[in-house]
Amino acid sequence: MFHSSAMVNSHRKPMFNIHRGFYCLTAILPQICICSQFSVPSSYHFTEDPGAFPVATNGERFPWQELRLPSVVIPLHYDLFVHPNLTSLDFVASEKIEVLVSNATQFIILHSKDLEITNATLQSEEDSRYMKPGKELKVLSYPAHEQIALLVPEKLTPHLKYYVAMDFQAKLGDGFEGFYKSTYRTLGGETRILAVTDFEPTQARMAFPCFDEPLFKANFSIKIRRESRHIALSNMPKVKTIELEGGLLEDHFETTVKMSTYLVAYIVCDFHSLSGFTSSGVKVSIYASPDKRNQTHYALQASLKLLDFYEKYFDIYYPLSKLDLIAIPDFAPGAMENWGLITYRETSLLFDPKTSSASDKLWVTRVIAHELAHQWFGNLVTMEWWNDIWLKEGFAKYMELIAVNATYPELQFDDYFLNVCFEVITKDSLNSSRPISKPAETPTQIQEMFDEVSYNKGACILNMLKDFLGEEKFQKGIIQYLKKFSYRNAKNDDLWSSLSNSCLESDFTSGGVCHSDPKMTSNMLAFLGENAEVKEMMTTWTLQKGIPLLVVKQDGCSLRLQQERFLQGVFQEDPEWRALQERYLWHIPLTYSTSSSNVIHRHILKSKTDTLDLPEKTSWVKFNVDSNGYYIVHYEGHGWDQLITQLNQNHTLLRPKDRVGLIHDVFQLVGAGRLTLDKALDMTYYLQHETSSPALLEGLSYLESFYHMMDRRNISDISENLKRYLLQYFKPVIDRQSWSDKGSVWDRMLRSALLKLACDLNHAPCIQKAAELFSQWMESSGKLNIPTDVLKIVYSVGAQTTAGWNYLLEQYELSMSSAEQNKILYALSTSKHQEKLLKLIELGMEGKVIKTQNLAALLHAIARRPKGQQLAWDFVRENWTHLLKKFDLGSYDIRMIISGTTAHFSSKDKLQEVKLFFESLEAQGSHLDIFQTVLETITKNIKWLEKNLPTLRTWLMVNT
């Protein structure tokens, strides 16, 4: 799954930007695998005290008390029939589940949520063979655990197969989960309906009763009944279509490969497609609503290239004969990797050359790469439980880097990947962060696992490990992992084992070391000679939260190293700092270079302190080469002064990514109280001469964030001086920008960012040019093609007049491009009129003109503006109950609404307001980890201002 708001730029600044066989032995495998994959809990007894068991909806004792299902009944195969009615907006369905019993039991527990089960029967394998009718089963329901119990008349016999049949029905959902309805508007203004599924993590149970846990893999044979004006899609290719009385059609699909329930998918719609074939013969089709089929060309081209790449890289063929990618008009995540039928937000799949920018193209490519990687990581090999979702999400995020670099090098995603790591450091440097692997039991807890820690940090530690082991060894290890656990489930240790043993016999040196390099220290060579230590090292990154700080002190040719836990908002002088440092120790694969040589040196820091000897005297040393390591570096003594001097004298002696890393680390260290703000600001002087777009964008992002912080707090003297400094020092590079779509991807993204900043700061030439283009666009009735990279800027300037704002809202409703709609919606959110902002929020809640899927990002964008911050916060408090009717408590949307409307606060009054609101929610039984994250973030903001405001004021007075 790809989670990201369609309107939140992934450069840590909230903006509207688009930025998510093998059938042999199947009869034998289930019996072989039961012992290794499933075990009966030791506490599993049927004679427990009745008082210990929950009560079903009919008042009877429910025979199971755990959130996790018992493993005494294993599903092998589902026959599923579904008939959705897109007029009455409901569906009827039936299923027959083949199960294998491992222990005697008188009940079968499975998941079901909001389904009306009208009939349930049980047949033994022998009864089925002789066509004997099934025996009626009593159904008990326990909604608190989303479980049902099927009570059997006599105990089921171990090692025998049975068939459970059920008839059921339900309404198509109004939200974004289970089997739900979506709508779209045609070019002619007609509203049409489709029915679509989204099951991850625990919503398959809303569409059919099932064993809805990733460990319960099975095969699925699906039949869908529909009207002739619609098509039906599912995971597998269609085998045949049967014509029924009354004009209905019934599509039968091939039986799936063995897979988890959350990957099942089916859709009934009237979409059109564009298709092509990979070099290995897989048919790839891109589906979209009929009027948007012309926006599917790029997605098809990218999908074909990426699928070919993955088959070669993983040395495993994609196991299905087709792969469909479909753009869903109403879809909560960025995308979902259902095997063979990947569902996307329109903004994550469709590309319109007239309205999609360079960053839009990068976004679409990334999300396609992410979901296609899941066809191996997640689908072919699945985590045993949701506590380890990083095994699929971290890998898919990491494979974006590998795959996009290989297939579209011109997109220069290698440079962009730094942001993936920088984004998560913001959260991981708070005490409220969590380990990558963390227990999660309830549906809400499971949903909360879909966050930056699983995705971004997971990807970053994999990239660090790849850099450490070497690309070839790392690739061999993951191929071994995928082949060993195909169609099975895996856990962390299985991955480390595969990566530890990825050295082939021919790879070893005479000394028994799998990788040899003269720049490695002796402890690095020793480590690589002891492959088992991969697990020992990596568990320090997956089982403890946070990020390490490497403190470096140079003394002649000697380097003294010390590691600490890096914490934002908690300073060394604070009483709690020392306690928060205890028991934290990482095995850090260090890299460093010096002013004397381009050689990259390597060393593993496994202790709190260590000493390194340099081969020669050097004026500076730079750790974390290319920012491949997941750690912050602080240079004590004159270390920072020497690096800043080098940047000012000749910044090109430091590698481009190292310059980005230095800018990032220096400002992060200010937030941790380890450096004064003036030291970090002094570093920005050199940016006048910087030609690398990533470094320029990194520096500008911090300066711009300070400006917005002052603007929201109405600290006008500082905000005006910051504006003056930005326009004074960056005017040459701003004035060099053309209002066009020319240049490399990074040239274009820099242009968008610089011109947006200039117009935000009311730079007269920028405002004048944007207003001129907007007037021409209005006069052309929206037909003028404005360069896509400046489209959002032009719309934002135009939205500042009532006539412009109203016209944009009209165009938003008429537009057939989701990319353009995102840019318009961002522009509308920049209005300084609160009644207009409130209208946008109301339209988002209603969900017709502005789809509810965009509400979280809309609130986030409005809250960042001085005129919108209180409005958005008040709206959330007053409409919390209504918001929970639209989004699940643990959903990404709810978490984004909470953080997006509160995390920018920086006063004690606001901290108290937010704290009281969270306490009131917890009193009602609603608890989320994001509550503590937000409170810590606001506290961090308060402390940042207290510590740095006088310095910022003084520095600006001297430098403007």
Curated annotation (Swiss-Prot):
Per the record, membrane topology reads: Single-pass type II membrane protein
Q: Which UniProt keywords apply?
A: Adaptive immunity, Aminopeptidase, Disulfide bond, Endoplasmic reticulum, Glycoprotein, Hydrolase, Immunity, Membrane, Metal-binding, Metalloprotease, Protease, Signal-anchor, Transmembrane, Transmembrane helix, Zinc
Chain positions of site Transition state stabilizer: Y455
Q: How is it modified after translation?
A: N-glycosylated.
Q: Which residues lie on this side of the membrane: Cytoplasmic?
A: 1-20
Task: List, separated by semicolons, the cofactors it needs.
Answer: Zn(2+)
Q: Name one GO cellular component term.
A: cytoplasm
Q: Name one GO biological process term.
A: regulation of blood pressure
Sequence intervals crossing the membrane: 21-40
GO MF term (any one): metalloaminopeptidase activity
Tissue expression as described in the entry: Ubiquitously expressed. Highly expressed in spleen and leukocytes.
Give the glycosylated residues.
N85, N119, N219, N405, N650
Cite the EC number: 3.4.11.-
Recorded superkingdom? Eukaryota
Active site (catalytic residues): E371
User: Where, in this chain's numbering, is substrate bound?
Assistant: E200, G334, A335, M336, E337, N338
Protein location: Endoplasmic reticulum membrane
The record's listing under InterPro entries reads:
Aminopeptidase_N-like_N (IPR045357), Aminopeptidase_N-like_N_sf (IPR042097), ERAP1-like_C_dom (IPR024571), M1_APN-typ (IPR034016), Peptidase_M1 (IPR001930), Peptidase_M1_aminopeptidases (IPR050344), Peptidase_M1_dom (IPR014782), Peptidase_M4/M1_CTD_sf (IPR027268)
- Asked if the record carries the keyword ATP-binding, the reply is no
- Cofactor binding mode and count: Binds 1 zinc ion per subunit.
Something else the entry says is: Defects in the expression of this gene may cause improper antigen processing, possibly leading to favor tumor escape from the immune surveillance.
Q: Which family does it belong to?
A: Belongs to the peptidase M1 family.
State whether it acts alone or in a complex, and with which partners, per the record: Heterodimer with ERAP1.
| Function field | Aminopeptidase that plays a central role in peptide trimming, a step required for the generation of most HLA class I-binding peptides. Peptide trimming is essential to customize longer precursor peptides to fit them to the correct length required for presentation on MHC class I molecules. Preferentially hydrolyzes the basic residues Arg and Lys.
Write the protein's name: Endoplasmic reticulum aminopeptidase 2
Q: Which organism is it from?
A: Homo sapiens (Human)
Q: What is the lineage of its organism?
A: Eukaryota, Metazoa, Chordata, Craniata, Vertebrata
